[in-house]
């Protein structure tokens, strides 16, 4: 894609189209909530970063196949050249994205929201950002701001969760 900025680009990420003289670090769009707001029957986020995440991935693909109508699966696809990390670290970068809650794993099934992976011990956003060269220009204060935005977004998603949703399929958790 040419490593160009999009509405889904994380806050503070370097891209080939990011202005360098006066960078503007807008927050990324919440694609899952946008899609769910359009009444799509099944919306989910997926990533491959650990065995529990693989089980979550499979369950969501299976569920999407069962749902009638339009389904939307937002799959995290790390990009070594664009994100500036070694290719052999792709699974680790995906794991850090999820475990830092920067890329929450969730689903909205016919309007019922559920966080499907809750890290028992979330890693600081700085670990996810530090694994990639595209965030190397950020100051400690900017990283703290991103951490607060990630925390606020997680809290918003947790508040959207439907009562009793954990009874349907328990959220997995990293040990």
Region locations from a protein language model:
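Flexible, low-complexity linker and terminal segments
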Residues: 77-175
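Histidine- and/or cysteine-centered catalytic micro-motif in compact active-site loops
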Residues: 48-49, 76-78
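Thiamine diphosphate
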Residues: 1-69, 87
